[in-house]
Each structure stands twice: as structure tokens, then as C-alpha cells.
A protein has these predicted regions:
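Short, surface-exposed charged micro-motifs
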Residues: 102-105
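Acidic, proline/glycine-enriched N-terminal capping motif
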Residues: 1-89, 93, 98-100, 327
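Conserved, structured C-terminal
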Residues: 1-27, 32, 107-465
Length: 465
């Protein structure tokens, strides 16, 4: 068994392969905690946090005269002004207009870029670069889990209200003006460090990278400079929650498993690829894998550029006026969550699916059904506990007709029929969790009005009818 297609065929289809995979949530191979994940989460809203992104993403370097043409042919983005020191959230679709994935595209030079993200988007671009005659050279630096040689670059992120003061302290003075999602350079410990400007918690920060041999020198300088500014190192447990709080879909299910036009791609992908090992879990169950696919608009990617030809353009044009899903945050009801934890003391299979803190999702692609008046209106994903909000929250894509802020919906937590036989899923029963719709990204004030009601009697988890 060598290819993804062969693995799918042996499993009885893509859905069966994904639902029986023993793999859990995506791995961030750094220290789980440096202090404790609660303080590490709160640092990105109260002081500053240093996050190590050196290990969990794949880097795909592409250089050559056709570099921009390659990405324009396979991306929904506008590339007319893309050049050195620019960056984009690159989004690729299949021929039906469903999202394969997104990754960050860094303009290293006018004809040299670096595509950084989970492996599936680099896989897709590499396949097309090599198979359709583009005048480019491709170099791949695998994520640490797939890389026995070590990474060629480090990648750090400094974010939070005190981040800019810390970065200017490291730089020895004001940082040259870097526009949002553009790139520049700063100096750290005498080293020239490239930087991308973006932000968390409504405060500016920088993503920093350079040669891997300089990583520990740069890290030590950042930690020393941040000593008086409340800098905290963030570990893998805190990092796994950041995307939900900031309103970013860490990964959609890649829309590559059934498109007949992608048969050659599935034959090219190894059976042990990210796409072949990934898992699907949760209460949102369908026999059609297309029901797990999303469009760019569903995810809030409103920057589709129809003024150029790209894979998926015609399908998206035809679907432009169709009803859409809307990305929201769901704030889970406190008492319903408490009831789930209370059920852990019940005998046998009477307990609910355990909610691991701070990230309770237990599959690479978590999908839980969102219900309104008995009708499924979308799905919830990446449920986490936020110490900043003191709430359990999740991202969700729901029918835009029902996506009003403040509205109440229900999430079905846990899998049907006692759970799948994946080793990470204990036998359990499903529970219904009420949730309030909030903006995405979530705002700090949403917790007002959702405080615990101490007079409310304890009750067992409700189960789906």
C-alpha cells in the first residue's frame, strides 16, 4: 500500500479511513507547558507571550520565473501586487470550489517564496509545480515530526500588549514601519531577523524567523529583554487554543478525497501522508464527504479574486449567490459543561465524552453537530477552554440565516452509538450543550451575561432525542 488512493480503497472509502484513523489532534512538538497553560494563555492579552512555531509546520520554498503564476493558478488570491516582503493567507480550492486549505505565503524575494502551514497545502502546490511544467525549483523543509535531519529555520512569534515595546527594546530603537501582513527586518542579539507583522488580542506583534543555528541565541535574547515586561513562554497546550480564540480555522478538511480530477494527486500522495493519516471525529455524521467540505466564503475568506483564472473559479462564480455558512464563536453554557464533567463520576457507559483541557477536540478534523429547533444548521469545531474568557468556546460554521450574535443553539457533544472504536475515544453517551453565538474572533465582553447562576439546581447532561 503506497498511495493515498490505495489506502482509501482498502479502507472502503475516505470517510471510513478518516473515521478509523488512530491519530488524535494535530501535534505541536514543543514543551506542553513552561509554567502553566492558563497563565500562558492570559499572557497574550495581558503582557506578552513567546510562541515557538519552529516545528509543527511544513515549509515549501519555491523559486523561479513562474513562481507567482503557479500560486495565481491555484489560489483564490489577488497576486497583482505581490512581491518581496509581502505576505498572504494563501487559499487553494478544488475544481468544485471547495477549500483544500490555507497557508501563509511569504515573499522572500521577487521570484522566491516560502509557503508555511500544515502539510496539505504544501503537498498540493508541490504536486502541481512538479507536474505541469512550471519554471520553478522546489525545496521542502518538513515539519519536525517528519524530519530526521532537523529544521533549516526557526520561527518564533511575540504577541500581546507589551510585545511592541519588547521588540523595540530588542531592536535597540524604533522598528522601521512595517505594514500589517507585510515583512521587514529587526535586529536581535546582533542578528538580522526577518519579521512578519500581524496581531493577536488586538495588539501588534511579529512573527520572526532565521537560520536554525541562531535559534537559541535569539530565544535567549528575547527572554532576557522580556523579563521586566511580563513575557511568558507559551507551550504546546496553550498554543493549541490560540486559533479558536483568534477566530482562525486551524485546518478545514481538505477537499481532495472525491474529486475525479484529483485522482492523479491521490495516487501521488503517500499512504502515510498527512491526508492519509488524519482522523475525523465528532457528532456531525454524514455519508457524503462533500458535507464536510466548505467554500472560502463559509470560512470568512471574502478575498476571492475573480479577475484571474484559478482552479475552482468557475464553480465559485456559479455558487456566488447560494446560501452560505457563517463563521462564529460559540460560548458554551457553563452548567451544561459542568454536567459533562459531573458525568465522569457515573458508572459504566453513562459518562459523557471527556473534555480534555484546554483543547477538548480528539481528532485531526473535529466536527460536532450544531442544532436549532431539532434541525442541524452547521458544525462546531476546535472546542477549547479560554482562561482569558473563563469559558469553553468553539469555532462554528452555521447557516447564515441563524447566525445572529446572542442567539442560542445546541451542540451535540460526543459521538453516536457510544463512540467510534478509535483508541482515543472511550465509550460514552452524547450530551446536548447550549451555546450562545458570539463574533469570531471572540471579544472579551462576551462573557458578560453568561455568568454562572448559583441558584440554578444541578442537573444531568441532556441527551439527544
Amino acid at each position: 500500500m503506497t498511495s493515498l488512493q490505495e489506502k482509501m480503497d482498502r479502507a472502503g472509502g475516505a470517510l471510513e479511513m478518516l473515521r478509523t484513523s488512530p491519530i488524535g489532534q494535530y501535534v505541536f512538538p514543543v514543551a506542553p507547558e513552561f509554567s502553566n497553560w492558563r497563565d500562558e494563555q492570559e499572557a497574550w492579552t495581558r503582557s506578552a507571550v513567546l510562541l515557538d512555531q519552529s516545528h509543527h509546520m511544513t515549509d515549501l520554498y519555491i523559486e523561479g520565473l513562474d513562481t507567482i503564476r503557479l500560486f495565481a493558478d491555484f489560489g483564490i488570491n489577488n497576486f497583482r501586487t505581490f512581491r518581496r516582503n509581502k505576505a498572504k493567507q494563501f487559499v487553494a480550492c478544488n475544481h468544485d470550489g471547495h477549500v483544500i486549505g490555507d497557508a501563509i505565503l511569504f515573499g522572500l524575494d521577487d521570484f522566491r517564496v516560502n509557503l508555511v502551514g500544515r502539510p496539505h497545502v504544501p503537498n498540493w502546490i508541490q504536486y502541481n509545480a512538479l507536474n505541469w511544467g512550471y519554471d520553478v525549483v522546489v525545496e521542502r523543509d518538513e515539519r519536525s515530526l517528519d524530519n530526521g535531519r532537523g529544521r533549516r529555520s526557526y520561527r518564533f512569534e511575540v504577541q500581546g500588549p507589551n510585545a511592541w515595546a519588547l521588540l523595540e527594546k530588542l531592536n535597540g530603537g524604533p522598528i522601521d514601519d512595517i505594514r500589517f501582513f507585510s515583512m521587514g527586518q529587526i535586529t536581535i542579539a546582533g542578528r538580522r531577523v526577518r519579521a512578519l507583522k500581524h496581531g493577536m488580542a488586538a495588539a501588534p506583534g511579529l512573527e520572526l524567523w532565521g537560520p536554525a543555528p541562531e535559534a537559541e541565541e535569539v530565544r535567549a535574547a528575547i527572554l532576557e529583554a522580556g523579563r521586566d515586561l511580563g513575557l511568558v513562554q507559551g507551550g504546546g497546550r496553550a498554543y493549541s487554543t490560540a486559533s479558536t480564540e483568534s477566530g482562525w480555522f486551524a485546518s478545514v478538511l481538505p477537499a481532495i478525497y472525491n474529486d475525479p480530477k484529483l485522482a492523479g494527486y491521490r495516487e501521488w500522495l503517500p499512504a502515510a501522508s498527512f491526508e492519509g493519516n488524519a482522523s475525523l471525529g465528532g457528532s456531525y455524521v454524514s455519508d457524503r464527504i462533500e458535507d464536510y467540505y466548505v467554500t472560502p466564503w463559509d470560512c470568512g475568506y471574502d478575498f476571492v479574486d475573480f479577475d484571474h483564472e484559478f482552479v475552482g473559479r468557475d464553480a465559485l462564480l456559479a455558487r456566488r449567490d447560494e446560501p452560505r455558512l457563517r463563521k462564529v464563536t460559540l460560548v458554551w453554557d457553563i452548567e451544561d459543561v459542568v454536567a459533562i464533567f459531573r458525568s465522569q463520576f457515573e458508572e459504566g457507559d453513562a459518562r459523557c465524552k471527556f473534555m480534555e483541557a484546554p483543547a477538548a477536540y480528539y481528532a485531526t478534523f473535529p466536527f460536532d453537530a450544531v442544532m436549532l429547533n431539532g434541525e442541524r444548521i452547521g458544525f462546531s469545531t476546535y472546542v477549547v477552554y479560554s482562561s482569558n474568557l473563563r469559558r469553553w468556546i468553539s469555532l462554528a460554521l452555521i447557516d447564515e440565516r441563524h447566525a445572529q450574535t446572542g442567539g442560542e443553539v445546541e451542540v451535540i457533544w460526543g459521538e453516536p452509538d457510544g463512540g467510534t472504536r478509535r483508541p482515543l475515544v472511550e465509550r460514552h453517551r452524547q450530551a446536548i450543550v447550549r451555546a450562545r453565538i458570539a463574533p469570531s474572533p471572540v471579544e472579551a465582553h462576551v462573557r458578560e451575561g453568561y455568568r454562572p447562576q448559583s441558584a440554578r439546581p444541578a442537573s444531568p447532561p441532556r441527551v439527544p432525542a
